[in-house]
Amino acid sequence: NAAGADFRIMGHKSTMIASTKPVIAVCAVRTGCGKSQTSRAVTGILKSMGKRVAAVRHPMPYGDLTKQICQRFASLEDLDVHHCTIEEREEYEPHIRAGNVVFAGIDYERILREAEKEADVILWDGGNNDMSFYRPNLYIVVADPHRAGHEVRYYPGETNARMADVVLINKTGTANPEDVKTVEQNIKRINPNARIIRAKSPVSVENAASIKGKRVLVVEDGPTLTHGDMKFGAGHIAAKNNGAAVIVDPRPYAVGSIKKTFEKYPHVTEVLPAMGYGKKQMKELEQTINAADCDLVLIGTPIDLGRLLKINKPALRVTYELDQPSINALKTEIERVLGGA
């Protein structure tokens, strides 16, 4: 304020940019609800309908912003060219591996106009529980019953829940049924016109049998654990489901900023958040993993950490996708908007 700046909480009518193409927005009520697998499911549906899709990702303003005005990612090499952090890679890499082009940056009108040149449909891939930057034809919002009640307790996540055309209650296969019911009741109370889809996100591990009886270090998506307030993620579920003998406490092995992360977020005890906001922090994450006394590392992050870190022990990746019934339900909603063409 001393410099004369004004600060306001802006509404969607003031901030959303209109596209010349149909827009499907995927947002959430909290970090770590499952936007990423929902976005991947939506792009898969659109491609099966013969549509060209451009995914536009919510900004993550790290580094020199003057070099990030309008970014286009079509290959894994593009992630290196733009010096992407682990957090950025976690959002971009799964899209790229699925054959999707991702746009990001800081000038979101310019980004939209570039994306429109390549696409029949724009996918807004939300982040930070923020509202869509683009005016959507279909607003899909993901909620998490592992954090029941958060859908009406956090801003701007609750704003998304109130604006949604479709609310996808994710992770119902691992959540308490009463918590699923609580989320559904809250959504019906604040947004009675929203269509509700109950979804599961089953986890899978290649060579899962090798987990049984092992002492396992679990590495999870960082933001989900930290400002998302989760105590565990897909890696922890995979370890439990596949008979790990021990889930190793990572805290005694943490160094530098990773150690400070555990101090700042004391609810995180059994899993290691994959923090990587720069080269130094990536190195500290690598050192923490390599120092851990374990037989196996289970990586529950959306990216292949093995491409970025030199891990000195066996490691397995955990993946997760939406289940087919929820994908079918999403397809019905998308066809309703796009006319099934």
Where are these regions (language model features)?
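N-terminal pre-Walker A segment at the start of P-loop NTPase domains
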Residues: 2-8
